[in-house]
C-alpha cells in the first residue's frame, strides 16, 4: 500500500470508529470512502457492529456494500441518516468542500443534507487555502444546451471541459447527466457562487458542499486530526 493509500485508510478508520450499532449510515463514493465501506463490512462480519443499514451515494458504492454483506436501504425509506462518511477533492479552512471527482455529487449532496453528521475523510494534500485552487469544480448538467452552459461558465472566468470516459465517450452520472469540469481558479466566496450556479437553468447540481461537513478527519505524517466544525470562523491549522 502506498503512503497516500495508507493515509486514506488511517482517516477512514478514525471516522468508522464513530459508528454505533443501530445506525443508518451514508456510504460515500470514491477511493477514500471505499476504505470506510470495507471497514464497515469487516466490523459487521466480526460482530463489532450490528443492526446497521447503509444508504449508498452511488451505484458503485451499492455494489461494493452488497459484496461486503452490508444491508442497504434508500433515502426514501429512512427518516434520517445518522452519519455519512465520504471523501472530498478539496477542503478549505472553513470546511467547505469541492466534491464530485467521481461524478456522484448529486446523490452525495442529497445524502449529506439528510444526515445528522457528515464525516469527511482526507489526506493532507486535499487541504487548500481556497476552493478551486487545486481542483476543478464539477458541474452536473443536462444534455440540452450543455455547450451553452459551458460557454456561460467560461464567461465567468477559467476554462471548462466536458468530462470523458477512458474510451473518449462522455462520462455519464448515475442519473444519466453530463459533467462539466470548470477550472475556475480560487473561489472568493463559495456561497455566492453556489447560489449563482443553483439559479442557472440547465445545471442539475454543482460540487460545492457548504455547511455540510460536521467532522473532518485529516491524515498526515503525524497521524489523524479530528476537526469538528466550529459555529463560525476558520478551522485550526
Curated annotation (Swiss-Prot):
The keyword Isomerase applies. Pathway: Carbohydrate degradation; pentose phosphate pathway; D-ribose 5-phosphate from D-ribulose 5-phosphate (non-oxidative stage): step 1/1. It holds the Pfam family Rib_5-P_isom_A. One of its GO terms (molecular function) is ribose-5-phosphate isomerase activity. The keyword Isomerase applies. Gene3D superfamilies: 3.30.70.260, 3.40.50.1360. One of its GO terms (biological process) is pentose-phosphate shunt, non-oxidative branch. It catalyses: aldehydo-D-ribose 5-phosphate = D-ribulose 5-phosphate. SUPFAM superfamilies: D-ribose-5-phosphate isomerase (RpiA), lid domain, NagB/RpiA/CoA transferase-like. Substrate binds at residues 29-32, 86-89, 99-102, 126. Keywords: Isomerase. Its EC number is 5.3.1.6. HAMAP family: Rib_5P_isom_A (MF_00170). Belongs to the ribose 5-phosphate isomerase family. NCBIfam families: PRK00702.1, rpiA. This is Ribose-5-phosphate isomerase A. It comes from Chloroflexus aggregans (strain MD-66 / DSM 9485). The gene is rpiA.
Amino acid at each position: 500500500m502506498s503512503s497516500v493509500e495508507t493515509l486514506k485508510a488511517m482517516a477512514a478508520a478514525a471516522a468508522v470508529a464513530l459508528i454505533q450499532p443501530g445506525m443508518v449510515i451514508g456510504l460515500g463514493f470514491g477511493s477514500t470512502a471505499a476504505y470506510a465501506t470495507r471497514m464497515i463490512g469487516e466490523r459487521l462480519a466480526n460482530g463489532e457492529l450490528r443492526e446497521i443499514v447503509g444508504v449508498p451515494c452511488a451505484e458503485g458504492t451499492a455494489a461494493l456494500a452488497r459484496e461486503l454483506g452490508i444491508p442497504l436501504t434508500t433515502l426514501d425509506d429512512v427518516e434520517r441518516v445518522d452519519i455519512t462518511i465520504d471523501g472530498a477533492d478539496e477542503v478549505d479552512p472553513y470546511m467547505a468542500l469541492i466534491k464530485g471527482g467521481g461524478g456522484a455529487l448529486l446523490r452525495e449532496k442529497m445524502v449529506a443534507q439528510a444526515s445528522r453528521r457528515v464525516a469527511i475523510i482526507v489526506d493532507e494534500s486535499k487541504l487548500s487555502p481556497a476552493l478551486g485552487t487545486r481542483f476543478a469544480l464539477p458541474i452536473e448538467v443536462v444534455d440540452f444546451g450543455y455547450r451553452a452552459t459551458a460557454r456561460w461558465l467560461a464567461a465567468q472566468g477559467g476554462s471548462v471541459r466536458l468530462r470523458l470516459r477512458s474510451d473518449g465517450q462522455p462520462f455519464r452520472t448515475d442519473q444519466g447527466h453530463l459533467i462539466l469540469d470548470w477550472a475556475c481558479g480560487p473561489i472568493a466566496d463559495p456561497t455566492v457562487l453556489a447560489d449563482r450556479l443553483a439559479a442557472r437553468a440547465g445545471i442539475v447540481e454543482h460540487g460545492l458542499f457548504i455547511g455540510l461537513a460536521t467532522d473532518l478527519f485529516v491524515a498526515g505524517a503525524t497521524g489523524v486530526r479530528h476537526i469538528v466544525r466550529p459555529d463560525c470562523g476558520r478551522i485550526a491549522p
